[in-house]
């Protein structure tokens, strides 16, 4: 008999339903100890894998600004592909079992010398964060708290929009644009990242992001990235998610907690 135990971003399949693992803390163990901890629990075989999260709305909920067809291809094929490929990689090497997604990304970034698992792990996280950075009826201006912080750090919401848009349009090739909270400076900043890289690797706290890989907008906007970004800011971005993330980010920064909060 087998059971499935769910932890943050990770699922564990265990060959005995009487055994339950909850948020295993294996990071302080050596690789050899971690393998022994996972594989030698009374002869049980433990397998870890990451699941494909569903966007927090129906696939047609963002229409007409982002079509159901885009979600079917982007989430259903591209995003699923990153999850599947990551699981295949982890299945070949159990040294990374037990990591949360955030821990996995930081570990596999390897101080700028990425391990093979990094790209797929980061893309799984990036896409989860992107879907949760949008909502039906989104756009417009942020709520008071977020707006005040944007005004403080960028001078005005208009200045923020211009900087965010410019970052998206000048990101050459594939990548992402993020609004992040810088931990040390305790201020908001717009950053752009190439390919799969995300702000977690620099210990920044992401607040919102937009995907500027071509597959994220080509079905709806062809090669008109400017129209896609303008639509994202006017009709799609979830300032509700941003407000929630900001509140948690500020709490983590003020309390000095080591973990990065996500939506």
UniProtKB/Swiss-Prot annotation:
GO cellular component assignments: chloroplast; chloroplast nucleoid; chloroplast thylakoid; plastid nucleoid; thylakoid
Residues annotated as binding Fe cation: 74, 127, 211, 215
Stretches assigned to coiled coil: none
Cofactor: Fe cation
Source superkingdom: Eukaryota
Subcellular location per the Swiss-Prot or TrEMBL entry: Plastid, Chloroplast thylakoid
InterPro entries: Mn/Fe_SOD, Mn/Fe_SOD_BS, Mn/Fe_SOD_C, Mn/Fe_SOD_N, Mn/Fe_SOD_N_sf, SOD_C_sf
Enzyme Commission number, as recorded: 1.15.1.1
Catalytic activity entry: 2 superoxide + 2 H(+) = H2O2 + O2
Pfam families the UniProt entry points to: Sod_Fe_C (PF02777), Sod_Fe_N (PF00081)
Targeting signal (transit peptide) range: 1-41
Knockout consequences: Pale green phenotype. Abnormal plastids, highly vacuolated and without internal membrane structures like thylakoids.
Record note on cofactor: Binds 1 Fe cation per subunit.
GO molecular function, one term: superoxide dismutase activity
Regulation of its function: Activated by cpn20/cpn21 (in vitro).
Record-stated family: Belongs to the iron/manganese superoxide dismutase family.
Function (record text): Destroys superoxide anion radicals which are normally produced within the cells and which are toxic to biological systems. Plays important role in chloroplast development, particularly in the maintenance of thylakoids membranes. Seems to act as a heterodimer with FSD2.
Assembly and oligomerization: Homodimer. Heterodimer with FSD2. Interacts with MRL7.
Protein name from the UniProt record: Superoxide dismutase [Fe] 3, chloroplastic
């Amino acid at each position: 008999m087998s059971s499935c135990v769910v932890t943050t971003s990770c699922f564990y399949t265990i060959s005995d339903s009487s055994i339950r693992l909850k948020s295993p803390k294996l990071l302080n163990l050596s690789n050899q100890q971690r393998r022994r901890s996972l594989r030698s629990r009374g002869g049980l075989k433990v397998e870890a894998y990451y699941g494909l999260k569903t966007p927090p709305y129906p696939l047609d909920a963002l229409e007409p600004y982002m079509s159901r067809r885009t979600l079917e291809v982007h989430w259903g094929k591209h995003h699923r592909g990153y999850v599947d490929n990551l699981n295949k990689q982890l299945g070949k090497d159990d040294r990374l079992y037990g990591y949360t997604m955030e821990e996995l990304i930081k570990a596999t970034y390897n101080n700028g010398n990425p391990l093979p698992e990094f790209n797929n792990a980061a893309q799984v996280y990036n896409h989860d964060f992107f879907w949760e950075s949008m909502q039906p009826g989104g756009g417009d201006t942020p709520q008071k708290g977020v707006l005040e912080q944007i005004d403080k750090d960028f001078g005005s919401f208009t200045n923020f929009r211009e900087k965010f848009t410019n970052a998206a349009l000048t990101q050459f090739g594939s990548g992402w644009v993020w609004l992040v909270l810088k931990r040390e400076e305790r201020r908001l900043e717009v950053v752009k990242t190439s390919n799969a890289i995300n702000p977690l690797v620099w210990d920044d706290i992401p607040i919102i992001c937009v995907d500027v890989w071509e597959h994220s907008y080509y079905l709806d906007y062809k090669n008109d990235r400017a129209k896609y970004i303008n639509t994202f800011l006017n009709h799609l971005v979830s300032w509700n998610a941003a407000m929630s993330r900001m509140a948690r980010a500020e709490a983590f920064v003020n309390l000095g907690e080591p973990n990065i909060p996500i939506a």
